[in-house]
Amino acid sequence: MILHAQAKHGKPGLPWLVFLHGFSGDCHEWQEVGEAFADYSRLYVDLPGHGGSATISVDGFDDVTGLLCKTLVSYNILNFWLVGYSLGGRVAMMAACQELAGLCGVVVEGGHPGLQNAEQRAERQRSDRQWAQRFRTEPLTAVFADWYQQPVFASLNDDQRRGLVALRSNNNGATLAAMLEATSLAVQPDLRANLSARTFAFYYLCGERDSKFRALAAELAADCHVIPRAGHNAHRENPAGVIASLAQILRF
C-alpha cells in the first residue's frame, strides 16, 4: 500500500521536492508554492486519513513514515527534500530522524519537535481526544469554526477563517479523528536531541506573527527563516515569502 500523491516532473538530475500538508489539508495545499519550482520534480502527498488517502488508517508515526518510504520507492524517488507544514512537518522530522537514504534535507514550516514532559503529553492527549470526538460526531463546519479560534491561528482575519472552514469541511470527520489520535503530539517523541545530531540539512520556516513557533524554532539547531506578514500557516498567508525562502534554501 502507498499513499495517494500527485507527481509533477521537472528536469532530470535535480532532487525531488516532496510536500507534506498539515492536518485537514491535502495534496493541493502546497501547490501554489511548489509550482514555482518547475525545474524540480514535485510530489504532493495525501497523508493518511486525508484526500485520496482518506481510507488509509495508521496506528502511529511508524506506520506513516513506513507508508511515506514505500510511496517514495514506488515513484523511484532516490534523491529528495521533504517539505512539511505543521503535521506534515512533524512527519518529515520523524522520517528524517530515521536516516532515510537519499534525503538531501528537510524544510519544516510550523512543525512541533515534541513535548518534553509527561504532564504536557497528558494534557495534549486529553485535548486531542476531545477534538477527535467532535470530528467524529459533529458537523465539520461547526468543529472547524472552533478549531480556527485556537490561539495559534490568532493572526487569521474573519474572511481567512471562513475560507479555511469551508475548505476543511470537505474532509471525512471520522478519518480525520483517527489520524489526529494516531499522530497526536502526545505520542510523538521529543525530537530535539535527534535533530541536533542530524546528518541532513534542516531549515525551519515560521510566520513573524506566530510567536509560539518562533519560540520553538529558537530551541532547534536549524537555520530559521521568518516569513513576513504571516502567522502559523505561512505558505497560505504569504506564499511569495515562502517561495523566496525555499528558493534561497535550494540554492545552497
Swiss-Prot record:
First and last residue of the signal peptide: none
RNA-binding in keyword set: no
First-tier enzyme category under EC: lyase
Top-level taxon in the UniProt lineage: Bacteria
Catalytic function, reaction form: 5-enolpyruvoyl-6-hydroxy-2-succinyl-cyclohex-3-ene-1-carboxylate = (1R,6R)-6-hydroxy-2-succinyl-cyclohexa-2,4-diene-1-carboxylate + pyruvate
Keywords, comma-separated and alphabetical: Lyase, Menaquinone biosynthesis
One BP annotation, GO: menaquinone biosynthetic process
Entry's Gene Ontology molecular function annotations: 2-succinyl-6-hydroxy-2,4-cyclohexadiene-1-carboxylate synthase activity
Pathway: Quinol/quinone metabolism; 1,4-dihydroxy-2-naphthoate biosynthesis; 1,4-dihydroxy-2-naphthoate from chorismate: step 3/7; Quinol/quinone metabolism; menaquinone biosynthesis
Name of one Pfam family that matches: Abhydrolase_6
Entry EC number(s): 4.2.99.20
PANTHER family reported in the protein's UniProt record: 2-SUCCINYL-5-ENOLPYRUVYL-6-HYDROXY-3-CYCLOHEXENE-1-CARBOXYLATE SYNTHASE, PROTEIN PHYLLO, CHLOROPLASTIC
Family label: Belongs to the AB hydrolase superfamily. MenH family.
UniProt subunit comment: Monomer.
Known role: Catalyzes a proton abstraction reaction that results in 2,5-elimination of pyruvate from 2-succinyl-5-enolpyruvyl-6-hydroxy-3-cyclohexene-1-carboxylate (SEPHCHC) and the formation of 2-succinyl-6-hydroxy-2,4-cyclohexadiene-1-carboxylate (SHCHC).
Protein name: 2-succinyl-6-hydroxy-2,4-cyclohexadiene-1-carboxylate synthase
